[in-house]
Regions:
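Nucleic-acid-binding surface
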Residues: 3-7, 17, 22, 35-180
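A short, conserved structural fragment
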Residues: 25-31
Length: 180
């Protein structure tokens, strides 16, 4: 299990006791402010604990949902538009408007981590919104995989999401032309 410094202080009540747990091998410091009771912890688990309000999006979400086999070089996370810059080199941060940030958020378990991630319906909207910023082959691969999943998706939810986002007409036209 992964602990933050705050959780360690609650459990062991002092820095001395935390260091004592580390020295005896009961606790391992993974990085500054992040501890674990096992020595091997995935980077995904560390990021999900270190940034609990962050939501996995774009390349990371496409990969975790099985829509592409391209493993992203960075963890793509969405944060509120007014959030501070995260200087973590492992992360690519997307600033999202507050009123649409939490639309379509769900949780997923990947190996030893429980992550907050956008659902497949939300990610279809994101794919269409950012299609000009993605490599064409990558876009077509993901779109083709969505066409294969069309009967598993909640079409009503997709239409609700499309109406909520900026430029709803453009999103609806792209859905009709390229997906349905």
């Amino acid at each position: 299990m992964i602990y933050t410094y705050k959780e360690c202080m609650k459990k062991w009540s002092s820095n001395y006791q935390i260091k004592k747990q580390i020295d005896t091998g009961n606790l391992f410091q993974i990085e500054k402010g992040i501890y674990s009771d096992t020595p091997d912890v995935s980077t995904l688990a560390v990021i999900s604990v270190k940034y609990p309000k962050a939501i996995f999006t774009m390349d990371s979400a496409f990969y975790y949902h099985g829509l592409t086999d391209v493993i992203p070089d960075e963890y793509h996370i969405a944060t509120d538009k007014h959030s501070i810059y995260l200087s973590d080199k492992r992360i690519r941060q997307y600033y999202i408007l507050s009123d649409i940030l939490n639309i379509g958020v769900t949780t997923m378990t990947r190996r030893d981590a429980v992550i907050r991630i956008y659902d497949k319906e939300r990610m279809l909207i994101e794919l269409l919104r950012y299609k000009n910023k993605l490599p064409f082959d990558y876009y077509k691969e993901i779109l083709g995989n969505y066409r294969g999943l069309i009967y598993e998706l909640d079409i009503e939810r997709i239409q609700e999401y499309a109406a909520t986002f900026p430029k709803p007409k453009m999103i609806s036209e792209a859905l009709d032309a390229e997906v349905f």
